[in-house]
């Protein structure tokens, strides 16, 4: 896994440096983060490596690709999630963008598919991002006989405010629901500091809550991350939509 991963990163960096790529590449970012639950009986922590890149087809149309790898521990059990996604983006103006996305999270031979619509807006010191979509989970591993794919509605909103040229504050909310009685949500608040060469350090704390037919539980999470943006002033247009990013706090 490590050899393949290093090969992928090497090819991406080589591709980024080519002249033909620079003519169409409009933005991207690479981030490394660490997250964990702070008040749970289960020892839960892990790290995530995420990368996104965007290619402009024209002034209005662009395509974004996402790659994410998350490795974590829950109660002594180790696992990882590989996330791949693509976005089709329409840039309505310099400040507003709309898109559709489709992707898949994979872990131990099982997969979760997700797709939906999204929008983003940035003006002066404010950046907004939102999405609404469907997450399809194969119930086979969890229910005897299987029920096929179970579709869950998922939505999220995030806002970032630039306090000055260095510091930012942000907030986010993500929710996934099967019914009113079954679902989960995450709410978080964070701060960031942008250093030279578009390199940002950030930290976030928040709450994750789950509800299953009258029974609910919640826990506090915290994460830290380092992100390098390149090719454009904002990196890739949209955030990643995989489960590890949207609901697990990575």
Could you tell me what each predicted segment is?
Residues 21-73, 248-250:
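Short glycine/proline- and aromatic-enriched beta-strand/turn motifs that initiate or cap beta-hairpins
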Residues 32-40, 67-73, 102-108, 113, ...:
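Transmembrane beta-strands of outer-membrane beta-barrel pores
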Residues 25-28, 59-65, 90, 94-100, ...:
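Repeated loop/turn-to-beta-strand initiation elements of outer-membrane beta-barrel proteins
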């Amino acid at each position: 896994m490590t050899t393949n991963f290093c090969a992928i990163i090497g090819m991406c960096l080589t591709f980024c440096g080519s002249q033909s790529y620079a003519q169409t590449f409009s933005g991207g970012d690479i981030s490394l983060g660490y997250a964990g639950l702070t008040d749970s009986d289960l020892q839960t922590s892990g790290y995530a490596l995420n990368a996104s890149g965007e290619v402009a087809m024209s002034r209005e149309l662009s395509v974004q690709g996402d790659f994410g790898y998350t490795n974590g521990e829950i109660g002594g059990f180790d696992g990882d999630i590989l996330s791949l996604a693509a976005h089709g983006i329409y840039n309505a103006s310099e400040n507003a963008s709309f898109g559709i996305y489709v992707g898949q999270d994979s872990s131990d031979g099982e997969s979760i598919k997700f797709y939906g619509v999204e929008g983003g807006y940035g003006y002066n010191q404010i950046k907004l991002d939102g999405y609404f979509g469907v997450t399809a989970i194969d119930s086979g591993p969890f229910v005897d006989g299987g029920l096929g794919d179970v579709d869950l509605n998922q939505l999220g909103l995030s806002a970032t405010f630039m306090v000055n040229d260095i510091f930012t504050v942000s907030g986010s909310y993500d929710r996934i629901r099967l019914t009113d009685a079954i679902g989960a949500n995450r709410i978080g608040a964070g701060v960031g500091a942008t250093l030279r060469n578009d390199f940002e350090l950030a930290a976030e704390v928040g709450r994750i809550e789950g509800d299953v037919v009258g029974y609910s539980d919640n826990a506090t999470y915290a994460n830290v991350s380092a992100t390098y943006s390149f090719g454009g002033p904002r990196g890739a247009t949209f955030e990643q939509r995989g489960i590890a990013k949207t609901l697990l706090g990575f």
